[in-house]
Amino acid sequence: MLIVVGPSKHPPGSHEVAAGGRLVQACITNLINLPGVKAQVVYEWPPEKSVREAASTVVFIGDTFPLNRWPDSKKSLAELGDMMQRGCGIVCLHYAVGLLGEDVKPDGEHPLLHWLGGYFAHQTCAHFHSVARIFSAATIVSAAPAHPILRGWREFTVNDEPYINNYFGPNNNQPASNVTVLATSLLPPEAPKREAVAWCVERPDGGRGFGIVMPHFYKNWRNEDLRRFILNGIVWSAKLEVPAGGVKTAPPDLEQFKPASVEYVPPPPKPKAKAAN
């Protein structure tokens, strides 16, 4: 498995994409009930074809979809497209499901829509606006209980930023027939609506995609249900059998992966503009 860490400028304790990538690698390579899985973390799109060809799935973590934030995005997207055509899996975690207006065509078209099944449409997009907002208590519930990714975790409530009003395509924003909504949450609390917060796709090329819009806060990797949900999705995307009770891992020591901070450190308030004389 290939874990690709993109750039991030979020405050300490939020996103923590490098630490998050290392944590995912440690969990995947030390699964108690699915031993022998190999994973590599990279901090740029790998130029070596051999690295790309060896991957059964590629996991992205970063502030928006990383390939659109790095130079030569056209080339790297084409190389990722080659991986997808051979049936490689793809996973995007939290903001890595995001695309900016400059990344997509005016109608919202982008290959990620088909590779992953849906995406977070940034407010700069002309065609659609998803919503990013922190909720103190978002309850995440299963929407497809029979799916392997749903094995072994229960409904949970989390203080996080599960994106809502995610984009699933031009058909009145209905997911395509090969897309399964895996989990929903009734958000926002003042006008609750069942929002898709995780989904997967089984593509015509034989590959699989999994998108989940959490975790925003690094400390939420401690949540066993959320962690199992994510790791199940990664395993499934690589066409491995998800164990009956979901994958099992030891509780991770979050400090071990060298985040800027485990706890969220809000940015200092911006200085107020001086009143004109």
Short names for language-model regions:
Residues 3-4, 182, 210-214:
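Active-site-proximal beta-strand elements of phosphoester/diester hydrolases
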Residues 7, 45-47, 96, 155, ...:
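Short, solvent-exposed coil/turn elements at secondary-structure transition points
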Residues 10-13, 132-138, 154, 187, ...:
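Active-site rim elements
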Residues 19, 23-26, 75, 79, ...:
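Extracytoplasmic/secreted proteins, especially bacterial periplasmic and envelope-associated proteins
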Residues 23-26, 188-196, 202-277:
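Extracellular ligand-binding/catalytic regions of CAZymes and related secreted enzymes
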Residues 121-206:
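Catalytic beta-strand/loop cores that center a nucleophilic Ser/Cys/Thr
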